[in-house]
Regions:
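Polybasic low-complexity intrinsically disordered regions
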Residues: 1-202
Length: 202
């Protein structure tokens, strides 16, 4: 139940009545709502998901073996891996992170599927990687195997989606609004959010 939506709708109807606006005459419009999140590169996204899962086990003392993965709990580790290791090819660093993800999941043996951090890690791997003919997991090739617009953009806001409009990239949501209109003015009487996944071509 969205209590905020119910409250806004109720107040809007009362305002429309007070202004003498005929609620039977309505018009609809849509707008894009930008999510308050960073636009992550693929290596940043994968790192963030692995780090969150490792930190979950470290912070909750689950007993999962984190040997070799301890560095993900260091607050400075992300900057070191992502920004201060440019002498190491980004594909090599990304492959290492993917391998770390598989190591962690293998050690967990499917026991933590109910944990949000694990759900996001599994989703990220499914959307950003594929298993090659040799049985090895690798990053999807841009263009040929690009993730869908509905893919995870940032683990801090899992529902935010991607679209390209007017030559610009947007990460967030689409809002559909219903406006009651009359000679005395107008007021928004209802709204809803949906995934912002359609480009200009759609």
């Amino acid at each position: 139940v969205d209590l905020f939506h119910d409250c806004v709708k109720d107040l809007s109807e009362k305002i429309a009545k007070m202004m003498g606006i005929n609620s039977r005459i309505k018009r609809m419009d849509s707008l894009m709502i930008e999510a308050n999140i960073r636009n992550l590169s693929r290596i940043e996204l994968l790192y963030s998901c692995v780090a969150r899962a490792v930190k979950y086990h470290h912070g909750n003392h689950t007993g999962i073996d984190l040997s070799g993965l301890e560095h993900y709990t260091d607050p400075d580790d992300q900057n070191l891996v992502i920004y201060h290791s440019r002498n190491i090819d980004v594909d090599v660093r990304t492959a290492t992170i993917i391998n770390d993800a598989e190591i962690l999941l293998d050690r967990c043996q499917g026991q933590y599927g109910h944990v949000k951090e694990h759900q996001l890690l599994l989703r990220c791997l499914e959307e950003q990687t594929v298993i090659d003919d040799n049985g090895k997991r690798r990053l999807r090739i841009k263009g040929e195997e690009s993730p869908k617009p509905t893919s995870l953009q940032n683990p801090t806001d899992p529902e935010a989606t991607f679209s390209a409009k007017a030559g610009k990239k947007h990460i967030g949501y689409a809002a559909n609004i219903v406006e009651a209109v009359s000679d005395g003015g107008s007021v928004i009487v209802d709204y809803q959010y949906e995934q912002n996944i359609y480009s200009d071509s759609r």
